[in-house]
Amino acid sequence: PDEQVMADLDACLVWAGLHGGDLMRVYATGFCWGGRVTWLYAAHQAMLKSAVAWYGRLTAGHGPLHVTHPIDVVDRLKAPVLGLYGEKDAGIPVTDVHAMQAALLKGSDKAMASEIRLYENADHGFFADYRPMYQAKAAKDGWQRCLAWFRQHPPAQ
C-alpha cells in the first residue's frame, strides 16, 4: 500500500541521516510506478527539495493498494515536481497529463512551481534504453532537464 511505501522511504531518510547522509540535500526521482510514488512522496515529505517524476500514473491506479493519486495531492505538494511524459503513452493519456497541469496551477505554491514536459512521439518508458520504446532524443533531453531541475532547487544555505 501507498502508506507502507511512504513509511519505507521515510525510514530510508532516517537511515541516511544516521549514516552520514546530508538531509539538507534530499531529492527524489522515479520511473513508471516510481514516478507515481515520486509525486506522492513530494506531497508527504517536507525534507524533499524537489523531485522528478518520469511517466508516473497521475489518476486512477491499479487497485485497492493505490487509493491516492497524484492529481489528488497537488494541494499538498511540499516540493516542486518536474513531470516528464510521452504523448504516445497508452497507459497515461494526454488528457490526464493536461488535467494534472491544470490542477498544478490551482494547487499549493510548490504545485504552481512544478512543471510538466510532454514529449511528442514518446511512449511510456522512453528513457529505458534497453526497451523498444526508447527515444534517445527525449531521454537525453529529459535527463538534462532532471539534472537542471535539481540544480535549480538547491538546499537552504
Annotate each PLM feature.
Residues 1-157:
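N-terminal cap/leader regions of alpha/beta-hydrolase-fold enzymes
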